[in-house]
Design a protein with these regions (language model features):
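N-terminal entry segment of metal-dependent catalytic domains or homologous docking segments
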Residues: 1-17, 22, 28-32, 88, ...
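Activation on terminal intrinsically disordered regulatory regions flanking enzyme cores
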Residues: 104, 108, 172-185
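Short strand-connecting beta-turns/loops that link adjacent beta-strands
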Residues: 6-7, 74-76, 184
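Active-site-proximal, acidic helix/loop segment immediately C-terminal to a metal-coordinating Asp/Glu
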Residues: 16-40, 122, 126-171, 183-185
Length: 185
């Protein structure tokens, strides 16, 4: 989570493909680099293009990573999502749930990789949720339907449920980020 200006806040999530040290390094590399690129004034799309190219030429082994960027425009009250191989995000508003997903490949697979970009208007009380693929969509939907929970309670409940649903020795990582929107006075 970082600010690029007084009016913009970014949340970035990346999940290295595969397991172990290589996947961890690819996701750390992607988050670190996208943060620095955006903070230096680069757009999300240009930063994605550069990371895609860098993962393709990095070392002899294949390097892939999902890239999930949420840009909150504080004055305009909008959120923009850039998704490249990322799990669905969710917008919870007034008891309803909207999934924000895409079909783009993870960064590093194709020479030309076009991310999915979408934008939504935000309202007071909205809850935005980003997760890694270790959190199943059905679990997120179930937890978010619980009215009255604050962002921390949502993350805690969702994390506990996702851990309980691990089966067959599956040890995929679980990352959950929630942001609740409050109107400025």
């Amino acid at each position: 989570v970082f600010d690029s200006s007084v009016n913009e806040k970014y949340i970035v999530l990346s999940d290295g493909m595969g397991t172990g040290k290589r996947a961890r390094l690819d996701s750390l590399f992607s988050v670190s680099l996208v943060t620095r690129l955006i903070q230096s004034g680069m757009s999300m799309q240009t930063a994605h293009r550069l990371i895609n190219s860098m993962l393709r030429v990095k070392g002899w082994e294949e390097s892939f990573a999902t890239l999930d960027i949420m840009r909150l425009e504080l004055n305009g009250g909008t959120v923009q999502f850039l998704k490249s191989g990322a799990a669905q995000s969710f917008l919870f508003r007034d008891g309803g749930l909207k999934a924000i997903g895409g079909q783009a490949f993870p960064a590093g697979i194709l020479a030309e990789c076009t991310p999915d970009v979408s934008e939504l208007k935000l309202f007071d009380g909205d809850v935005l949720l980003m997760t890694s693929d270790g959190v199943e969509d059905a679990t997120a939907r179930e937890i978010l339907r619980c009215n009255g929970m604050n962002a921390q309670e949502i993350v805690t409940a969702l994390g506990a449920k996702a851990l309980a649903q691990r089966t067959g020795g599956r040890r995929d990582d679980i990352t959950i980020i929630a942001a609740k929107i409050f109107l400025r006075d």
